[in-house]
A protein has these predicted regions:
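Surface-exposed loop/edge segments in extracytoplasmic proteins
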Residues: 18-20, 52-55, 118-122
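Acidic, glycine-rich loop-and-strand cores that form catalytic or ligand-binding grooves
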Residues: 113-172
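Enriched but not universal
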Residues: 1-41, 75-76, 196-206
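Outer-membrane beta-barrel transmembrane strand signature
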Residues: 172-181
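A residue-level signal for beta-strand positions that form part of recognition/binding surfaces
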Residues: 19-21, 39, 86, 109, ...
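Extracellular/periplasmic catalytic domains that process cell-envelope and extracellular macromolecules
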Residues: 34-36, 81, 116
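Glycine-rich strand-loop-strand elements at beta-sheet edges
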Residues: 23-28, 44-114, 130-141, 145-150, ...
Length: 206
């Protein structure tokens, strides 16, 4: 079994490393580094912005799509002797879509910071909300900072197609914090869709 030390003929043989994964899309908390850690990869996505309000006869394009949250990634090459120490995290919420001729709400900020283990703070801001179709502005992508590997600004939403921005793909194509679609240009108006929540993912190799 992976991660288990087998004793055969008086010899200790360690099998392939094991992955311990913590994956959060809501709230704040503490992650404890598992025992006998080797290394870690940490990814942070900000929450997606909400879509804008759509109303027929104003711009007839519908509301602007919300922007995607920023993305930050850090690799910790060596965690020897750090088992039991803690790291703090917050996963940002998705922004709500607009139900009035106002922009959708900005997505929440996601972050990783030091607990008893010292780490450079990682911050991924949420994407901006799309505007109503009375304006020609889509939600802007959130920025990111602090990652040792990557800090990527999220893609902006689309005004003409109402589409919310796709999230930045992380390791193995995983995502978080896509923007919400803008509302349809209908009589009486159509509410924008909410952005998807941010995400914080820890993958420890032990």
């Amino acid at each position: 079994m992976a991660g288990v030390i087998a004793v055969m003929a008086g010899l200790s043989v360690r099998t392939a490393p094991t992955l311990v994964i913590f994956d959060f899309s809501t709230g704040s908390g503490t992650v404890t580094i598992p025992a006998s850690p080797i290394s870690a990869v940490i990814e942070v996505w900000g929450g997606g912005g909400g879509g804008g309000f759509g109303l027929e006869g104003v711009g007839d394009n519908g509301g602007g799509g919300g922007g995607a949250g920023g993305y930050s990634k850090t690799t910790i090459a060596s965690l020897t002797g750090q088992g039991g120490k803690t790291i703090l995290y917050t996963a940002g919420v998705g922004g709500t879509g607009s139900n009035t001729p106002d922009p959708g709400n900005t997505g929440g900020t996601s972050s990783v910071s030091s607990g008893t283990y010292t780490i450079t703070p990682m911050i991924a801001f949420g994407g901006g909300g799309g505007t109503s179709d009375a304006n020609t502005i889509q939600g802007q992508g959130g920025t990111a900072s602090g990652g040792s590997d990557t800090n990527t600004t999220g893609t902006g939403g689309n005004f003409l197609t109402r589409a919310g921005a796709a999230a930045t793909a992380g390791v193995a194509g995983l995502q978080g914090g896509a923007g919400g679609d803008g509302g349809l240009p209908t009589i009486g108006g159509d509410r924008g869709e909410p952005g998807l929540p941010g995400r914080v993912r820890f993958v420890f190799t032990i």
